[in-house]
Structure formats: structure tokens, C-alpha cells
Curated annotation (Swiss-Prot):
Lineage: Bacteria, Bacillati, Cyanobacteriota, Cyanophyceae, Synechococcales
Similarity comment text for this entry: Belongs to the TRAFAC class OBG-HflX-like GTPase superfamily. OBG GTPase family.
Name this polypeptide is given: GTPase Obg
PROSITE patterns found in the cross-reference section: G_OBG, GTP1_OBG, OBG
Alphabetically ordered keywords of this record: Cytoplasm, GTP-binding, Hydrolase, Magnesium, Metal-binding, Nucleotide-binding
GO BP term, example: ribosome biogenesis
InterPro entries: G_OBG, GTP-bd, GTP-bd_Obg/CgtA, GTP1-OBG_CS, GTP1_OBG_dom, GTP1_OBG_dom_sf, OBG_GTPase, P-loop_NTPase
This enzyme's EC code(s): 3.6.5.-
């Protein structure tokens, strides 16, 4: 399935039905009064959050979404039927903007959340409405109102408590694959991950914690360089960031600083989120190299560094302990993951 996290669509409420002109035509009532009924209300377009959807791909194929029109009025004071509302399913985490003004219209986070985005038009009035002492046989009626027509921009922000960030090839996909049931594409070259991956990591309480592997960011990502800043929006909902640094890189400190600058430049409070700094790929380094690189990274960042090897499953237990603590979930042992111990180096 292709992951599409942005879409533009046009939504249109149904038109209200027209009122009509009619008069009573009954036996023994040769000059009956006006009896034209009112038109029905047009249907509205309503977005509904559905946890079963993970992408906005479907909207590529239905750029215009319309609700049903109201029916015109009938004789004998019968009102026209209202048009059916159009319920449109979107993934949980969809943020809705007016595409023309940029106005934020709503944020559909939880299952069943609804947002009315295009209201149906009111029905017109039949001639019975215009009966008065001065006009006993009105022929006046009104047409139904047009439904609202709005162009929307939809943006999907994944709902995850923990986001994994880092430069391409830092090992983010490997990490999420070994701590959860997620199975992202993994290879030893940059930009293997072209879409965010979600994985549920078990917690001893029985609850699952959702982790998101954010595709590799590079210098200038907040300006759209590389895979662009479109993936940074997925970090906005997270509560904790795991900042993964490749321990085999030529300059791990510089790699750390690049990502920090991108988070800071993007704004939206990303740089202020709690971060767990992690040095990955220690399985291909000797102990002295691990210690030296971790200490330099810790000194530059002003925080402790957890050292791990995602591919060798080393250090994942202490890492998850840090995650649970940051989430306020206590210091219980993580659920069984067949993990190997590792170190945390403090500056």
C-alpha cells in the first residue's frame, strides 16, 4: 500500500430542494388555497476518523465529494425529503485545513471523531408559506439554497507516543523491527524508508506503546531537501523522541547536530520534546571506540547516551526502560523481547 499523507479535495454540500407552487384540488372545493410544500435540506459532507485507515491514498481517486441534494416540495403541503449526509472516512490523525485560506478547520484524532466540512443548503419555501390576508392565492416560491463548496487540504499526522529520528541509514527501521512487530523494508543504503512505519511495542502493563520510525532526515529537511519536511509533521504528536545516531559514522557529533538543527528550524515545539540520545551499531566497534564516541556525543549534547546495537539486539532493555520512564510508565522490565544488556554513558 502506498503511503499518502497529504491530499487536496473539494467537498460540496447538497443543494436544498426548491419549494413549489400548488393549490388544493379537491372535489367540492373548486377554489382551494395554496398547498405548495417546502423543499428538503441538502445533505452535508462530514469527515469521520476511522482507525482502520492508514493513508489518504483513496482521495487521489475522488477529488470531488458531494452530498445528496434535497428533494423539491410536493403538493398538499408535503415537504421534500432531505438529502442524505455524505460520511467520508479518514485516518485517525488527519488534520483538516481550508486549502484557500489556510484556516485550520479541525483535527480528527480519536475513533469516530467527526467534522462537518460542507453544510447542505436550506430548502426553498413553497407558496403555502406566503399565504396572507392580503394574498389568498400566492404564486410565490423560493429556490433551495446551494450547498457549501469548500476546497480542503488534508494532512495526516501519525499518532505515536514515541518517534525515532536520525539521519538516513542510522538504523531506525532495524530498531523498530526488533522491538515491535513492524516489518519495514531494511537495507544498507540511505532512504530505504520512504514512508513512516508504525510498530506497537509491548509494555508489562499489557498496553502497547506505538513507535513511529520517521524516514531519514538530512540537512535542510525543514526546507524540503531530501525527503522534505513533510515527514517532520509526524513527529509533532509524539511525546518522546529516540534520536538515533550511527556509531560508525565519520562524525557522530555532527550527525547529531544536523538533526537537532532540523528539529529546531521546523518549529512546532519539536526541539522541546524529551529526547533519548542513542548511539547505534556498537556491535562493529571495539569497546574503546564505543566509550570514546559515546563520551564525545554526551559532552556535545549535554545528556546521557544509551549505546545499542539494534541488529544484534544489544542494549534494547535499558533503552526501553528509559522510554517507559519518559512516558511516566514506571521502571518495570519490558515485555519479553530476548534482549541483551548494554551501557548508558553519562557525561
Amino acid at each position: 500500500m502506498h503511503f499518502i499523507d497529504q491530499a487536496e479535495i473539494e467537498v460540496q454540500g447538497g443543494n436544498g430542494g426548491d419549494g413549489i407552487v400548488a393549490f388544493r384540488r379537491e372535489k367540492y372545493v373548486p377554489a382551494g388555497g395554496p398547498s405548495g410544500g417546502n423543499g428538503g435540506r441538502g445533505g452535508s459532507v462530514i469527515l469521520v476518523a476511522d482507525p482502520g485507515l492508514q493513508t489518504l491514498l483513496d482521495f487521489r481517486f475522488q477529488p470531488v465529494i458531494k452530498a445528496e441534494h434535497g428533494a423539491k416540495g410536493g403538493p398538499n403541503h408535503r415537504s421534500g425529503a432531505s438529502g442524505a449526509d455524505r460520511l467520508v472516512r479518514v485516518p485517525c490523525g488527519t488534520v483538516v485545513f481550508n486549502a484557500e485560506t489556510g484556516e485550520l478547520l479541525g483535527d480528527l484524532v480519536g475513533k469516530g471523531d467527526q467534522l462537518l466540512v460542507a453544510r447542505g443548503g436550506k430548502g426553498g419555501l413553497g407558496n403555502a408559506h406566503f399565504l396572507s390576508n392580503h394574498n389568498r392565492a400566492p404564486r410565490q416560491f423560493t429556490k433551495g439554497e446551494a450547498g457549501e463548496r469548500v476546497r480542503l487540504r488534508l494532512e495526516l499526522k501519525l499518532i505515536a507516543e514515541v518517534g525515532i529520528v536520525g539521519l538516513p541509514n542510522a538504523g531506525k527501521s532495524t530498531l523498530i523491527s526488533v522491538v515491535s512487530s513492524a516489518r519495514p523494508k531494511i537495507a544498507d543504503y540511505p532512504f530505504t524508508t520512504l514512508q513512516p512505519n508504525l510498530g506497537v511495542v509491548p509494555h508489562p502493563s499489557g498496553d502497547g506503546v506505538v513507535f513511529a520510525d520517521i524516514p531519514g532526515l538530512i540537512e535542510g529537511a525543514h526546507l524540503g531537501v531530501g525527503l522534505g519536511h513533510e515527514f517532520l509533521r509526524h513527529v509533532e504528536r509524539t511525546r518522546v523522541l529516540i534520536h538515533l545516531v550511527d556509531g560508525t559514522a565519520a562524525d557522530p557529533v555532527k550527525d547529531y547536530q544536523v538533526i537537532q538543527q532540523e528539529l529546531r528550524a521546523y518549529g512546532h515545539g519539536l526541539i522541546d520534546k524529551p529526547q533519548i540520545l542513542v548511539l547505534n551499531k556498537i556491535d562493529v566497534l571495539d569497546p574503546q571506540q564505543v566509550a570514546e564516541r559515546a563520551q564525545r556525543l554526551s559532552a556535545a549534547a549535554g545528556t546521557s547516551v544509551v549505546t545499542i546495537s539494534a541488529i544484534a539486539k544489544q542494549g534494547l532493555d535499558p533503552l526501553l526502560q528509559r522510554v517507559w520512564q519518559c512516558l511516566g510508565r514506571g521502571s518495570q522490565q519490558p515485555a519479553q523481547l530476548d534482549l541483551v544488556g548494554a551501557k548508558s554513558i553519562q557525561s
